[in-house]
Amino acid sequence: MAKAPKANTPKVTSTSSAVLTDFQETFKTSKRAYFAQIEKYPKLKLIDTFCFFLVLLGVIQCTFIILIRDNFPFNAFLAGFIICVGQFVLLMSLRLQLCNSFPGISKNRAFAEFIVASLILHFVCLHFIN
């Protein structure tokens, strides 16, 4: 009776430690890049704070709906959640445009587009509530 050849399987611990090391390096690099960007453009702190507030508000809304287990004014919940997500997306696009990622777009134009898009988003969500 012939013995089956042993398969060469990598150790799980070495793979997971390599992934953890890569993650730590990536996190440190991202953190350094973020703080360098904040140092170069200090107004981004306000945008980031507002984005954090929007994420927190969306989590609170979802938690409230889960805890009360009733979604009677469902259109109000949807409008509130959609406005949090939509405003977050608009702020991220404004943040990208303010960091000179798009050389053809001036900062004033980027801010004006943000204001118009925010007004449209709020108008749509307000009319969605009824």
UniProtKB/Swiss-Prot annotation:
The protein's annotated pathway: Protein modification; protein glycosylation
Keywords attached to this entry: Endoplasmic reticulum, Membrane, Transmembrane, Transmembrane helix
Effect of E113K: In OST2-6; ts; reduced activity
InterPro entries: DAD/Ost2 (IPR003038)
Any single biological process term in GO: protein N-linked glycosylation
Location of the protein in the cell: Endoplasmic reticulum membrane
Stretches of the chain found on the membrane's Lumenal side: 67-71
Keyword Cell division part of the UniProt annotation: no
Effect after changing S16P: In OST2-3; ts; reduced activity
Effect of R69C: In OST2-6; ts; reduced activity
Top-level taxon: Eukaryota
Effect of L119S: In OST2-2; ts; reduced activity
Effect of F123L: In OST2-2; ts; reduced activity
Topology relative to the membrane: Multi-pass membrane protein
GO CC list: endoplasmic reticulum; endoplasmic reticulum membrane; oligosaccharyltransferase complex
Positions of transmembrane segments: 46-66, 72-92, 110-130
Membrane-side (Cytoplasmic) residue stretches: 2-45, 93-109
Subunit structure: Component of the oligosaccharyltransferase (OST) complex, which appears to exist in two assemblies comprising OST1, OST2, OST4, OST5, STT3, SWP1, WPB1, and either OST3 or OST6. OST assembly occurs through the formation of 3 subcomplexes. Subcomplex 1 contains OST1 and OST5, subcomplex 2 contains STT3, OST3, and OST4, and subcomplex 3 contains OST2, WBP1, and SWP1. Interacts with SEC61 and SSS1.
Family: Belongs to the DAD/OST2 family.
UniProt name for this protein: Dolichyl-diphosphooligosaccharide--protein glycosyltransferase subunit OST2
